[in-house]
Amino acid sequence: MKNEKKKSGIEPKVFFPPLIIVGILCWLTVRDLDAANVVINAVFSYVTNVWGWAFEWYMIVMLFGWFWLVFGPYAKKRLGDEKPEFSTASWIFMMFASCTSAAVLFWGSIEIYYYISTPPFGLEPNSTGAKEIGLAYSLFHWGPLPWATYSFLSVAFAYFFFVRKMDVIRPSSTLVPLVGEKHAKGLFGTIVDNFYLVALIFAMGTSLGLATPLVTECMQWLFGIPHTLQLDAIIITCWIILNAICVACGLQKGVRIASDVRSYLSFLMLGWVFIVSGASFIMNYFTDSVGMLLMHLPRMLFYTDAIGKGGFPQGWTVFYWAWWVIYAIQMSIFLARISRGRTVRELCFGMVMGLTASTWILWTVLGSNTLLLMDKNILNIPQLIEQHVVARAIIETWAALPLSTATMWGFFILCFIATVTLINACSYTLAMSTCREVRDGEEPPLLVRIGWSVLVGIIGIVLLALGGLKPIQTAIIAGGCPLFFVNIMVTLSFIKDAKVHWKDK
């Protein structure tokens, strides 16, 4: 019994440091919001302008790594001895489901507006050229390049899971081949894990900070309840309580059902927007944007705007590359878990094709709808953002569709379910990562899961109190910096170990 308690308890060296660090940062921020905003702007400017190039080179090098995996000596190596656990159709569907978070719904609807109003390459705002490049940049930021980088890490984790039979719940577990067992399980490994956890906590908090206003703005539209910070806090609190009830009452099956409902509802809502918004225009705009992407791809890959200093690559490309970096380990572990029995080539191709299709469908349909509403003068997005918040502008892009009440109910339910599953996943991932070994079929302790969901909720509220997108962007970029190095170490550790255990025959 004592041994069981020890196994299911927290791991102090990776539980308390992130808790203390995040708690202090939240306290300092709330203590003086104005001073915090000054610091946030300074951090954002420093990281993006001084180190933005490093994020761009990271993505490019990882892209070459994807080609090496697909066409190199390990392409036909199987990740585990068993047959694939899921059919190809189910496998692709689970990938799509992982893309339909409320944060994705946030960016998919509004991102194109920012690209058109503050375009790259010195283009005139709101010009024809800006509109032509707008969706192309969304396809770039959410296309094959970032998914190729994820596929490399997914192969690495699948290798450690199913070939080396390692129980990986923290990144330090994968570093034994690179730095040795003494360092991986010692102070160095603890530091790596703490970097990972602090960054992951802030990433999840930012996702909640993006998702919550969508729900509260839906409530204002549907029920006339004014959107305030207090309402945001109440909604987040309700989600945390709901998550605690689900965990305490063993309703995890219900959460999984909700996740499936979210996926099916996403298909339904996207199909509705595609049909009523203008299917012909959407397909034409997508086709044109793919051409623009191919035409400008070399420049997009290396674009830092060092001479023009317009700030577009720093504000968007570097931000999104940091977004991808910060979620890489968590997402890659999930994708590796569902890819047992597949070959390296199959995993790499499946991820890039399946996940690119998912994100391209989302961004094309939602972005095209926003552009049409702007061109037809149905929505004045700058005015909506100035007078209200960004989330209000997003809500209005949905409310402008036919059968607006039914559409808004569908969007409200989708955002609500997406956020419930987000908090559940956040608390589970953080609890698993900060507890001692949890056996297969066991759940991490209830209080630990609730505690982490509360902390993530607090971060979401703090970011909402700061206002605007810059605090959210800065939290992602600052968190992405340490994980930049962690991801590289995991990759190098895999390459070093695979040379020994996957020798060419």
UniProtKB/Swiss-Prot annotation:
It is found in: Cell inner membrane. This is L-carnitine/gamma-butyrobetaine antiporter. GO terms for biological process: 4-(trimethylammonio)butanoate transport; carnitine metabolic process. It is a multi-pass membrane protein. One of its GO terms (cellular component) is plasma membrane. The chain crosses the membrane at residues 10-30, 51-71, 92-112, 143-163, 195-215, 231-251, 263-283, 316-336, 347-367, 403-423, 446-466, 475-495. Signal peptide: none annotated. Homotrimer. Pathway: Amine and polyamine metabolism; carnitine metabolism.
